[in-house]
Amino acid sequence: MGRSLKKGPFIADSLLKKIEKLNASGDKQVIKTWSRASTILPQMVGHTIAVHNGRQHVPVFVSEQMVGHKLGEFAPTRTFKGHAKSDKKARR
């Protein structure tokens, strides 16, 4: 179930302030954030945002196709190394 249209999209206040500040100055800097739940807004297009995946910050370049999605969708939290070669149960 999605978020109510009446409420609008969620975005961390600190992240929104940083984006607006960079848009006003015209700078292109990497913005570090831990807010994976923030929705990508049209103001963010063209910026690189480093999203925390639990271990490190993954740089995400925001494009127009990403608008409306969450930042956490583009920073995977799990790394699959593959099943063990001798483990026949897992490969079945």
Swiss-Prot record:
Ribonucleoprotein in keyword set: yes
Molecular function via GO: rRNA binding; structural constituent of ribosome
SUPFAM superfamilies according to UniProt: Ribosomal protein S19
UniProt key word Glycosyltransferase: no
Cellular component aspect of the GO annotation: cytoplasm; small ribosomal subunit
Domain of life, source organism: Bacteria
Gene Ontology annotations of biological process type: ribosomal small subunit assembly; translation
Coiled-coil residues: none
UniProt keyword annotations, A-Z: Ribonucleoprotein, Ribosomal protein, RNA-binding, rRNA-binding
InterPro entries, per the entry: Ribosomal_uS19 (IPR002222), Ribosomal_uS19_bac-type (IPR005732), Ribosomal_uS19_CS (IPR020934), Ribosomal_uS19_SF (IPR023575)
Similarity annotation: Belongs to the universal ribosomal protein uS19 family.
Protein task: Protein S19 forms a complex with S13 that binds strongly to the 16S ribosomal RNA.
Protein name as catalogued: Small ribosomal subunit protein uS19
Species lineage: Bacteria, Bacillati, Cyanobacteriota, Cyanophyceae, Oscillatoriophycideae
